[in-house]
């Protein structure tokens, strides 16, 4: 909403950059797709900075557990704002990083009237150079057909419509 309002005002001619968006604390980042779609609507939207990459939770003395807040014999507090990253302090992936990765995938596919529309979000690379698609069609948990999509020659920042060929 904030981004849409900014670009609705014709006087705003400068690019828009989100500062500390997607606060990655706990089970967060569920609105990443909403931010992505908003940025897609406006050419002047140039991204943002996720807060933040990793937790800052050191190991407790003589323990394999990481601590924060009052865990270090300091005054009890609600200081868990050091545990707000996409990865833990020892760089283990958190679920919100998987959400982020999925939203910012380099190729998106949409079904359209018996075709698949592919959009290549890569800036400099043809999709065929970076991506291969292997698919399986299943019925009652058994694979009935599988194959490879080889004609992914989609220029950077372009869209292609490919026929969807399903078995009879």
Regions found by a protein language model. Give the residues of each.
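Extended substrate-binding grooves/exosites of carbohydrate-active enzymes
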Residues: 1-117, 121-129, 134-142
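Intrinsically disordered, low-complexity Pro/Gly/Ser/Thr-rich segments with frequent PxxP/GP/PP motifs
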Residues: 131-168
């Amino acid at each position: 909403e904030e981004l849409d309002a900014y670009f609705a005002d014709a006087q705003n001619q400068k690019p828009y950059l989100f500062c500390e968006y997607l606060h990655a604390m706990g089970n967060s980042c569920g609105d990443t797709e909403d931010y992505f779609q908003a940025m897609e609507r406006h050419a002047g939207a140039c991204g943002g900075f996720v807060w933040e990459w990793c937790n800052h939770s050191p190991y407790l003395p003589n323990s394999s557990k990481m601590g924060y807040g009052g865990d270090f014999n300091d005054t009890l507090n609600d200081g868990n704002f050091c545990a707000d990253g996409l990865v833990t302090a020892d760089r283990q992936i958190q679920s919100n990083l998987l959400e982020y990765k999925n939203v910012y995938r380099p190729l998106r596919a949409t079904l359209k009237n018996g075709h698949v529309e592919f959009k290549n979000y890569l800036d400099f690379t043809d999709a065929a150079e970076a991506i291969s698609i292997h698919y399986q069609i299943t019925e009652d948990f058994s694979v009935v057909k599988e194959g490879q999509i080889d004609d992914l020659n989609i220029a950077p920042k372009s869209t292609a419509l490919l026929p969807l060929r399903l078995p009879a």
